[in-house]
Each structure stands twice: as C-alpha cells, then as structure tokens.
Swiss-Prot record:
Family: Belongs to the radical SAM superfamily. RlmN family.
Organism ancestry: Bacteria, Pseudomonadati, Pseudomonadota, Gammaproteobacteria, Enterobacterales
Active site: 113, 363
Note: Reaction proceeds by a ping-pong mechanism involving intermediate methylation of a conserved cysteine residue.
Cofactor, free-text remark: Binds 1 [4Fe-4S] cluster. The cluster is coordinated with 3 cysteines and an exchangeable S-adenosyl-L-methionine.
Task performed by this protein: Specifically methylates position 2 of adenine 2503 in 23S rRNA and position 2 of adenine 37 in tRNAs. m2A2503 modification seems to play a crucial role in the proofreading step occurring at the peptidyl transferase center and thus would serve to optimize ribosomal fidelity.
Broad EC category: transferase
Keyword Cell inner membrane tagged: no
Positions contributing to S-adenosyl-L-methionine binding: 187-188, 219, 241-243, 320
Keyword annotations from UniProtKB, A to Z: 4Fe-4S, Cytoplasm, Disulfide bond, Iron, Iron-sulfur, Metal-binding, Methyltransferase, rRNA processing, S-adenosyl-L-methionine, Transferase, tRNA processing
Protein's UniProt name: Dual-specificity RNA methyltransferase RlmN
Cystine pairings recorded for this chain: 126-363
Catalyzed reaction equations: adenosine(2503) in 23S rRNA + 2 reduced [2Fe-2S]-[ferredoxin] + 2 S-adenosyl-L-methionine = 2-methyladenosine(2503) in 23S rRNA + 5'-deoxyadenosine + L-methionine + 2 oxidized [2Fe-2S]-[ferredoxin] + S-adenosyl-L-homocysteine; adenosine(37) in tRNA + 2 reduced [2Fe-2S]-[ferredoxin] + 2 S-adenosyl-L-methionine = 2-methyladenosine(37) in tRNA + 5'-deoxyadenosine + L-methionine + 2 oxidized [2Fe-2S]-[ferredoxin] + S-adenosyl-L-homocysteine
Length: 382
C-alpha cells in the first residue's frame, strides 16, 4: 500500500532535517551507482539523478553542485545542504626526466603517493590502497613505514579523479589520458577488499571512469583466502608479487609467505583466472631481481618448475634502491640471462622499464614521504 503524499513528503523532510542538524554532509565521491540510487530515492528524487551527478563528477571532474546545469535551482539548493564532493588535496608534485609524475596526496597528517606513467601507446596510473603496509616485505620502502590504516573508497577514487582532472586541465601539455590503472602503490589491496571493490565498480562503471576490466590490475603479495573470494565480487586482471622461486627465499624476503606459501597462492590464482575474462587465461607473475638473492641460473629453473602448471606471464623487475636497506639490483647481464632461460622454456616474459627512479616513484620506492620518520630497522644483510 502506498503512503499518502503528505506523509511521504514529511518523511523526506525529516531525512533532510537530520542531515542539516547533524551538519554532516555525505561525501558522494566514492559512492557506487547503486548507493547513489538509494540516496536519491531516500531524499525523494528520481534515481536517474544518480547517473547525472556521476557524469558531472567522473566525466567533467566537477566538484561543485551549483555548476551542474541539468539540476534545477531547488535541487541544487537541496543537495548543497546534504552532500559534498570532497577529494584529497595535493601536497607535492614531482616530475621525472622520463615524464613520470608522482603526486603526494594529503590525508590529515598522513599522506599517500600516486604515480602517473606515460608510455607510447598508453598511460598507467599506479594507485595506493593503504597508508603504509603491514606485510613487511624486505625489499619495499612502503613496508618500512609500517601500517597506519586502510584507505576508504573515496580516498582510493580520489587519486584517480585528481590525476584525471589534472591531465584534463593541462591538455595544452599533451599529457596522455589514463588508459590503465594498477593497484601497485602503497599497501596490500586484498587486505582492503571492503573499500577496494566499491572503488573498482566506479572505475568500471560507464557513468564512472568507464575503463575496461582488462585495463585494471590488482597486484597482491598473495592473500590466498581473499583471492578465492575476489572472483565472486569483481573481475579484473590479477598480478601475483611472487619475487622468489621457492618458499625458503620467499620466507626471508616476504614474511607473509609463512602464512600463505607459494603453492597455496598459485592454486588460488589459478582458480581465479579459470573464471576470469579479464585475465585471458593467464596470471601475471611479478619477480623483482635482487642481486645474489633470487637471480641465479638455478633460481630461473626453480621458477620454471614452480610455474609449470600455471598459465602465466612473468614480469622481471629491476630492484629500485631506497634508504636503510643494503640490497643491490641484479646487473643487466644477470637479468638478461634469467630472461633468456624463461623465454627458452616457453614462458612469456618481459623486463620492466625503470620509470621515475629519479623522483623515487619507481616500483618499491613509494613511502608516503615519511621515510625520515621511520623507526630505522636493522640493515638487512645477506
């Protein structure tokens, strides 16, 4: 039975008054289309308003309701009282000689880093999912910051929104539009699934950023139970940060391996790609090259054996230096030899180009500009 019109209006007014009294406006950046449908219905508006406002936010990078020309004056005034479109502010910008840009974004007294990497045929945005990281990978600068907290969905989305807005505003500089997004910044994405999934839904939504699922990559150190859950929630490309050919080495450089070993990670990943359309039947394996740690000829053959039943492609990553750790990157000859062995055995392999190393924006170097505040751990020697 439908409620009388007068009663319906009273309920809507009560809801709006509640927003006004608490003086807590809802930040709609980072809200999925479904969440916005519910919101507009609750305040007595048609659900298509959700699609309109998403177009303004994610296609035109508008954060001011008063500029949304297809909203009536009454609706604008109504929304101004109950919503906000907040995004993170920039603390600093660094531009590399190779065109890579690193933005440090401020979150209260903390910050996160986001990296824009232009290439010939595409431009990739590397975003963060946490402030710091709890996994303590020995070769990664973020782990030396320690873990602060998960980013919420608006903070994840804000990185993309900000980067796309800058590129749009600087069109005279001919910056390439972002074509790919990788969750390879600060933090372990799969330990923040609650906020990651809504953010990815917005990235994929045609009323959001509208990117293809094959252009979104989640990189994980290997949280096996969450990989199993992921396929039921979202379908995007998955990359496993393996970085070792056996559990003995991986236990030393990636302590999470003591909980989720290589076998369990690869089995979970194999199951994920079996139902994923985004991955085209192959999982990406990331392998950082550490001198005398995991780069010997015997390690290449161990890796081949480890992956013999896993449809995959391997990305060899030269290690990028940061303070307090005495690792060294494998030299070119070692990396090239490792590469040739993998190729010879039929494994699709690439060597990642080092980008943004001069501004500490390369793989493994992101630390949120807090490296000087870190409790300096013992130097790692092997």
């Amino acid at each position: 039975m439908c409620l009388p019109l007068i009663l319906t209006i009273k309920i809507i007014n009560i809801i709006i008054n509640m927003f006004n009294k608490t003086n807590k406006k809802i930040n709609i950046l980072g809200k999925t289309r479904e969440e916005l449908y519910d919101f507009f219905i609750k305040i007595g508006e048609e659900k298509f308003r959700a699609e309109q406002i998403m177009k303004w936010i994610y296609k035109r990078y508008c954060d001011d309701v008063s500029l949304m020309t297809d909203f009536s004056k009454n609706l604008k005034n109504k929304l101004k009282n109950i919503i906000k479109i907040d995004h993170l502010d920039i603390e600093s910008e660094n531009i590399s000689q190779d065109g890579t840009i690193k933005w440090v974004l401020k979150i209260n007294d903390q910050n996160i880093e986001t990296v824009y990497i232009p290439e010939i045929n595409r431009a990739t945005l590397c975003i963060s999912s946490q402030i710091g990281c709890a996994l303590n990978c020995k070769f990664c600068a973020t782990s030396y910051q320690g873990f602060n907290r998960n980013l919420n969905s608006y903070e994840i989305i804000s990185q993309i929104w900000y980067a796309m807005k800058i590129i749009n505003d600087r069109n005279n500089f001919k910056l390439k539009k972002i074509t790919n997004i990788v969750m390879m910044g600060m933090g372990e994405p799969l330990l923040n699934l609650k906020n990651l999934v809504p953010a990815i839904k917005i990235i994929l939504d045609n009323y959001g950023f509208g990117l293809s699922k094959r252009r979104i990559t989640i990189s994980t150190a290997g949280i096996s139970p969450v990989i199993k859950k992921l396929g039921k929630l979202i379908d995007v490309k998955l990359a496993i940060s393996l970085h070792a050919p056996n559990d003995i080495i991986r236990n030393k450089i990636m302590p999470i391996n003591k909980k989720y070993n290589i076998k369990s990670i690869l089995l979970s990943a194999k199951k994920y790609i079996s139902t994923s359309k985004a991955n085209k039947g192959k999982i990406s394996i990331e392998y950082i090259m550490l001198n005398e740690i995991n780069d010997k000829t015997e390690h290449a053959y161990q890796l081949i054996n480890c992956l013999k039943n896993i449809p995959c492609k391997i990305n060899l990553i030269p290690w990028n230096p940061f303070p307090y750790v005495k690792y060294k990157c494998s030299n070119f000859n070692k990396i090239n030899n490792f590469y040739k062995i993998l190729i010879k055995h039929g494994i699709t392999t690439t060597i990642r180009k080092q980008r943004g190393i001069d501004i500490k924006a390369a793989c493994g170097q992101l630390s949120g500009n807090v490296i000087n505040r870190i409790n300096k751990r013992n130097i790692i020697n092997f």
